[in-house]
Amino acid sequence: MFKLLLVLALTMLAQSALAGGGSKSTDTVIRFG
C-alpha cells in the first residue's frame, strides 16, 4: 500500500517537473520527505 503511494508521489513529481514547476516539485519533496 505504501509503495503505491510512493509511486503516485513520484509520478506527480515527474509531471510537475515536466510542466516546469521546479518550485512545486521541491515543495512536494519536502512534504513527502
From Swiss-Prot:
Lineage top rank: taxon: Eukaryota
Record's subcellular location: Secreted
Secreted listed as a keyword: yes
Signal peptide annotation: 1-19
Other comment: Negative results: has no effect on human neuropeptide FF receptor 1 (NPFFR1), NPFFR2 and kisspeptin receptor 1 (KISS1R). Has mild effect on ASIC1a channels (8% inhibition at 10 uM) and no effect on ASIC1b channels.
Family: Belongs to the FARP (FMRFamide related peptide) family.
Protein name according to UniProt: U-limacoditoxin(13)-As11
Organism listed in the record: Acharia stimulea
